[in-house]
Structures are given as C-alpha cells and as structure tokens.
Amino acid sequence: MPRIDDELSPLQLNRFQQLRHFLTIEGLSRKHLTDILDTADTFIEVGSRSIKKVPLLRGKTVANLFFEASTRTRTTFELAAKRLSADVLNINITTSATSKGESLSDMLRNLEAMAVDMFVVRHAQSGAPHFIAKSVTPRVSVINAGDGRHAHPTQAMLDMLTIRQHKHKFEGLKVAIVGDILHSRVARSQIQALNLLGAEEVRVIAPDTLLPPYIDQFGVKVFSSMKEGMRDVDVVIMLRLQKERMEGALLPSEQEFFRLYGLSQDKLALAKPDAIVMHPGPINRGVEIESAVADGPQSVILNQVTNGIAVRMAVMSMAMSGQIAELTADEEVA
C-alpha cells in the first residue's frame, strides 16, 4: 500500500483519539469505524423529515474544494453540511484564483482568513488532503473526498453502512470487488474497512493488467475469473473502468471486458441467492454491469447514494466535535 498512510494515521486523530480530520481508513480502529456507522444510523431519519435539518454545525462554514469532477460526492457533501445547518461554500476551481496562478497554499490561507471551519477536498494528486491537513490551523478540519488512486474513505464508509443494513454484521461475509482495482481509490478504502470490520473474506476479481503490483499486501484473495471469484459471495461490488487514469492499452476493448468481467444475471447467479449488488458510481451500463442487474431486485446502488448523506453528516459532525474538543483542551491549558 502507498505509505502516505503512515503519516495520515496520527494526523487525523486528536489527543483523545477522536476524529479531527478524516483522511484515510488506515490507522483507525474498528471502534472508530463502528462509531461512524452508528452515528450515521442516527442521521438516516433526518432525510425523511419535513424539515431536513439538525443544528450540529450551525454557525460553522464548510468549503467544498473539488479539483476533480464529481456529482454524487460533491452533492451529498453539500446536502450533508446543509442538513447539519452549516453554511456551505462551493468553490468553482476553474474560475477561482488558482486558475490565475494562485498556489493551493495561498488559496487555503485566504479561505482560513474568512473563518472557514472545514475543507472537503477532492484532488487528482494522492496525498493532497494530507498536505492540506498539515497546513491548516487547529481551527480547521479536513475531509478527504477522494485523492488520486490513494483513498476515498467516506465512500468506503457509506458502502459499509449499506452492507451492515442488509447483512447486519460483517463476520462471515464473503465480498467480491470486481473491475479496475489498479486505479481505484474506492477499492483500497473498501478493502481496508472490510478487513478492519471483520469480513471473512475479501476477494478481488480483475485481469492482471488492472491489478496493482502490490496486491499481495492488501489482505485479499485474487481471482482472474468471474466463474471462480463470484462463487458463494454475499456482496458484489462493481467498479467503474477509470479510463481517464489509464495509460496504454490495458484492455482489448470494453466489449471484451464486459464479456469477461461485466456483471450479468448469469454471473450474478454464481453468488449466494441473497447477495447484494453495489457500485460506487458513476455506472457505465453494458461495460461493468448490465441494466437488468443494476436495476434488479438485488441492487442496492441507490441505497448507497442515500446512505452517503448520512455517513458524510456523521463524519463532518464527528470531525468538528474532535476539533472543538482539542481547541477546548488547549484553551484550558493556556
């Protein structure tokens, strides 16, 4: 695994071992993850209220800094912050001063001068949220909304919440992650979370060209065949082919990929009868999954989207609580 995580682990916790930033799954305890899931559970019903608000971040300002395109992640972070009663800034990177040559550090300093309390960051460069978390003052928390190939911890946690809702526990579960493992920050975070939460077996199914060279360090079983890898699994997680990150001819064609690794009803029949089907989105129908499966009775893909709001509410509220606890302790010492 990339060693960015060695520095991230202590950085994201305060002196009381509470979340201060949320940058990666690596280095957190099972209790940290279950606390996030349990907190998210309490926020799910907020979405069904006539007034979808709780006051936990009232008076706080959250800035969404998305240096990569996003629909679901950016929108659910915005909804999460607003449902927590925060003020939200959506920074348009293409029209911001960074497009005129302003450095990221200067941009952050200016936003801090405006008393922004939290940055939600998506960046193409692995480790960018880590750099930002190290750079900001103690009055700012940083949430990683996906960095390069490195990590996407909130996506992993909304996936864990979805699995727990449908399977009730992680012990005894066999989970298959299928597709572009090489370029997927989602897969890395999912694998870390599943292993930490006690899944019996995590499988990855992919052609050799879409596996990272250090896959043996992930704590997974590797399969090159759907016929073998799908057998008797409880959960199937399909991944998007990340063509924007691919260099060279890693695939003969999308049609050939679907024939070998796309999830059809025939391939899904190899899994357990009550297996659930997941996908982090966006879906490429007919490439990694066929419509009959994506829209079928075993699909929980839209459930994942709904859970994304609750999980991001949980992470943001917990990080803010960790920030406040640290600041309060510092003031008492002073």
Curated annotation (Swiss-Prot):
<comment type="subunit">
    <text>Heterododecamer (2C3:3R2) of six catalytic PyrB chains organized as two trimers (C3), and six regulatory PyrI chains organized as three dimers (R2).</text>
</comment>
<dbReference type="InterPro" id="IPR006131">
    <property type="entry name" value="Asp_carbamoyltransf_Asp/Orn-bd"/>
</dbReference>
<dbReference type="GO" id="GO:0006207">
    <property type="term" value="P:'de novo' pyrimidine nucleobase biosynthetic process"/>
</dbReference>
<feature type="binding site">
    <location>
        <position position="185"/>
    </location>
    <ligand>
        <name>L-aspartate</name>
    </ligand>
</feature>
<comment type="function">
    <text>Catalyzes the condensation of carbamoyl phosphate and aspartate to form carbamoyl aspartate and inorganic phosphate, the committed step in the de novo pyrimidine nucleotide biosynthesis pathway.</text>
</comment>
<feature type="binding site">
    <location>
        <position position="155"/>
    </location>
    <ligand>
        <name>carbamoyl phosphate</name>
    </ligand>
</feature>
<dbReference type="InterPro" id="IPR036901">
    <property type="entry name" value="Asp/Orn_carbamoylTrfase_sf"/>
</dbReference>
<feature type="binding site">
    <location>
        <position position="72"/>
    </location>
    <ligand>
        <name>carbamoyl phosphate</name>
    </ligand>
</feature>
<dbReference type="GO" id="GO:0005829">
    <property type="term" value="C:cytosol"/>
</dbReference>
<dbReference type="Pfam" id="PF02729">
    <property type="entry name" value="OTCace_N"/>
</dbReference>
<comment type="similarity">
    <text>Belongs to the aspartate/ornithine carbamoyltransferase superfamily. ATCase family.</text>
</comment>
<dbReference type="InterPro" id="IPR006132">
    <property type="entry name" value="Asp/Orn_carbamoyltranf_P-bd"/>
</dbReference>
<dbReference type="GO" id="GO:0004070">
    <property type="term" value="F:aspartate carbamoyltransferase activity"/>
</dbReference>
<dbReference type="InterPro" id="IPR002082">
    <property type="entry name" value="Asp_carbamoyltransf"/>
</dbReference>
<feature type="binding site">
    <location>
        <position position="240"/>
    </location>
    <ligand>
        <name>L-aspartate</name>
    </ligand>
</feature>
<feature type="binding site">
    <location>
        <position position="100"/>
    </location>
    <ligand>
        <name>L-aspartate</name>
    </ligand>
</feature>
<keyword id="KW-0808">Transferase</keyword>
<feature type="binding site">
    <location>
        <position position="282"/>
    </location>
    <ligand>
        <name>carbamoyl phosphate</name>
    </ligand>
</feature>
<dbReference type="GO" id="GO:0006520">
    <property type="term" value="P:amino acid metabolic process"/>
</dbReference>
<dbReference type="GO" id="GO:0016597">
    <property type="term" value="F:amino acid binding"/>
</dbReference>
<protein>
    <recommendedName>
        <fullName>Aspartate carbamoyltransferase catalytic subunit</fullName>
        <ecNumber>2.1.3.2</ecNumber>
    </recommendedName>
</protein>
<dbReference type="InterPro" id="IPR006130">
    <property type="entry name" value="Asp/Orn_carbamoylTrfase"/>
</dbReference>
<dbReference type="Pfam" id="PF00185">
    <property type="entry name" value="OTCace"/>
</dbReference>
<dbReference type="GO" id="GO:0044205">
    <property type="term" value="P:'de novo' UMP biosynthetic process"/>
</dbReference>
<keyword id="KW-0665">Pyrimidine biosynthesis</keyword>
<feature type="binding site">
    <location>
        <position position="152"/>
    </location>
    <ligand>
        <name>carbamoyl phosphate</name>
    </ligand>
</feature>
<feature type="binding site">
    <location>
        <position position="281"/>
    </location>
    <ligand>
        <name>carbamoyl phosphate</name>
    </ligand>
</feature>
<comment type="pathway">
    <text>Pyrimidine metabolism; UMP biosynthesis via de novo pathway; (S)-dihydroorotate from bicarbonate: step 2/3.</text>
</comment>
<feature type="binding site">
    <location>
        <position position="122"/>
    </location>
    <ligand>
        <name>carbamoyl phosphate</name>
    </ligand>
</feature>
<feature type="binding site">
    <location>
        <position position="73"/>
    </location>
    <ligand>
        <name>carbamoyl phosphate</name>
    </ligand>
</feature>
